[in-house]
Amino acid sequence: YQAYGVEPDGACFAKGLAGGVPIGAFMAKDKLAQAFKPGDHASTFGGNPFATSCGTVVMHELLDGGLLDNVKKQGELLSKRLMELKQKHSIIKEARGFGLIQGIELTIPAGDVIADCINNGLLLVGAGANVIRFVPALIVTEKEINEAMDILDKALFRAEEK
């Protein structure tokens, strides 16, 4: 929501909140929060001591440990490399996304390109018939992004030769 200038009255959080340990949370502005009484809203994994301890560590890393700086830096590199590939390969219709959630839309079905990448050590997943998603770990390195883009580049060349 922050990338679009939206400020929600409430938001649900889960999944990555505790680094893979099951947890859930709901945050709300005062006006909305006042509508809830104890027991109105619950989460199976919302507040046990182990999960909340893990969540505290994750929040510390996100806010104070420099992790978000790495996400920004590597996201910019990923975007740059995908745009370079778009200029190089006519089968890339569009490169889109921001941060470490990005994708390319191809003019051909993405399945063969994805399979080629997987066969060469790059695990990818599609999003629909013609889109390849890139959602690397938040700790991804510059070397890993460049290696991934090099594998993708070769797979795109092979797809264009068909």
Spans of model-derived segments:
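Conserved N-terminal phosphate-binding loop of PLP-dependent enzymes in the Aspartate aminotransferase
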Residues: 1-162
